[in-house]
UniProtKB/Swiss-Prot annotation:
Belongs to the phosphate acetyltransferase and butyryltransferase family. The gene is ptb. Catalyzes the conversion of butyryl-CoA through butyryl phosphate to butyrate. It catalyses: butanoyl-CoA + phosphate = butanoyl phosphate + CoA. Its EC number is 2.3.1.19. InterPro entries: P_Ac_Bu_trans, Phos_Acetyltrans/Butyryltrans, Phosphate_butyryltransferase, PTA_PTB. Keywords: Acyltransferase, Transferase. SUPFAM superfamilies: Isocitrate/Isopropylmalate dehydrogenase-like. This is Phosphate butyryltransferase. Pathway: Lipid metabolism; butanoate metabolism. It is an enzyme of class 2 (transferase). GO terms for biological process: butyrate metabolic process. The keyword Cell cycle does not apply. It holds the Pfam family PTA_PTB.
Amino acid sequence: MSKNFDELLSRLKEVPTKKVAVAVAQDEPVLEAIKEATENNIAQAILVGDKQQIHEIAKKINLDLSDYEIMDIKDPKKATLEAVKLVSSGHADMLMKGLVDTATFLRSVLNKEVGLRTGKLMSHVAVFDVEGWDRLLFLTDAAFNTYPEFKDKVGMINNAVVVAHACGIDVPRVAPICPVEVVNTSMQSTVDAALLAKMSDRGQIKGCVIDGPFALDNAISEEAAHHKGVTGSVAGKADILLLPNIEAANVMYKTLTYFSKSRNGGLLVGTSAPVILTSRADSFETKVNSIALAALVAARNK
């Protein structure tokens, strides 16, 4: 079981190196992350985009392109679709967003002919390695699903479990996070949490243990759980935090990023291959960590 990103990177040494297709690769921060990933055997890469601009950026950041496959496609929409094709056809194992707007990128991901649709819910999973914490924290969904309904939450849990399994956590503990740790029929998130816990009890959601509802404190702190009399195998020990909506999840994501000493990475799952969808504000390290996470998920998918 990996407890931090150093241990996650060590896990990659045990699997064949995976290949990432970068859509519209003429993006300096993305190419810097790709350089780091390839130099440390985290992943190999196929760069799809404007070849001249890619070479100009590579020269600026001292990136030797001699070992890279480059597909010269100047139009961003065509380049993005070609990168998706590389993944759906098996020539690459994962997809990464470069210098292309998110809407165009996702349209290609969802393309009916060559896209990465599976019929499952797509969701974002962030993984945090917080200094002083004894385990990784998996957070969903801070980027993709806005106001998930109950059926969406089932899909979000299943997707987060896939990532947790890839990180070596065989039976992750899942906590649906709510304002309070008791069922209140005026708070739909608490009702959903109780239903999810019952589905877990009956084996309807597999590969994990779900309990709830939980307030954040008694989901992650055994001391807080004990103080409030909250018991069970998940209380104070949660690995996966299912937030009720994107507002709560995004605030928590940014709180952990800016108010704690932590490392993180994230990816889009529910697709036929992992998708790395970082933002312009994400750090260099976050981009590299996201590539590593995607490589682990891709290795488990094979």
